[in-house]
Amino acid sequence: ARRGRSLQDVRFLSFDPASMRTAWNAVVTDRREPEVVEALRILMPEIDSVQFLAGRRRHNVLVGQRDVRPRLPIGSYGDGMRRLLAVSLALVATRNGCLLIDEIDTGLHWTVMEDMWRLVVEGAQRSNVQVFATTHSYDCIKGLGQLVRSRPDLADSVAVQKVHRKLAQAVRIAGDEIPIAVEQDIEVR
C-alpha cells in the first residue's frame, strides 16, 4: 500500500467562484459560518454576514455589515477581503488534507499579518490541515513571529523554511525561534 497523501488531499488556494462555492457548501454543512465571518472581521470588525448567491456568475458573494443595508459584493471591499474569504473557506474545505497558498500576504496590509496568521494556524488546527504558504514579505514573517510571541502554545504548529538556490536544502527555523530571528533582523525569507 502507498503511504502518504494522495493528490485529492492537496488543495491550492483558489479564487475561482465555483471552487469557493463548493468550499462554502462545506462550511455550511459543518456549521462553521461564524469562523468565516470572524476571518473577515480581521479587516472590518463591522462585518456580520457572508452570503453566496445561487446562479450568478458576477458578484456572487455578498458581505453584510451591522446597521448597513444592502449587503455589498465582496469585491467592494478589496483584494484582501477576497483573500481572507478564500483562505478561511479553504481551511474548512481541506479538512484532513494539505493546503498550498502562494504569496499568502498579497492584498493584506502589514498591520493585519499577526491576525491573518492566527486565522491560518487556528483554522488549520481545527480542520487538521497542513498549510504550506510562501511569501517574500518580511512583514508577513514578522507577523508570524508576533503571533508566536503572543501565543507560545502555537510555536510547535509553525515553522519557516528558508529556501535559497545556493543551498542544497532548506534552512528550517522552528516556531519558537521565529520571534528571535525577527528581533535579531535575521533574514528568513
Model-based region annotation:
Residues A1-V87, V92, C98, V158-R189:
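Phosphate-coordinating catalytic segments in nucleotide- and nucleic-acid-processing enzymes
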Residues R118-R189:
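C-terminal lobe/lid and adjacent interdomain/linker elements of RecA-like ASCE P-loop ATPase modules
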Residues R83-A86, D115, L119:
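Well-ordered alpha-helical segments embedded in enzymatic catalytic cores
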Residues D102-I104:
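Walker B catalytic acidic pair
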Residues R95-N96, V129:
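Short coil/turn segments at beta-strand junctions that form active-site/ligand-binding loops
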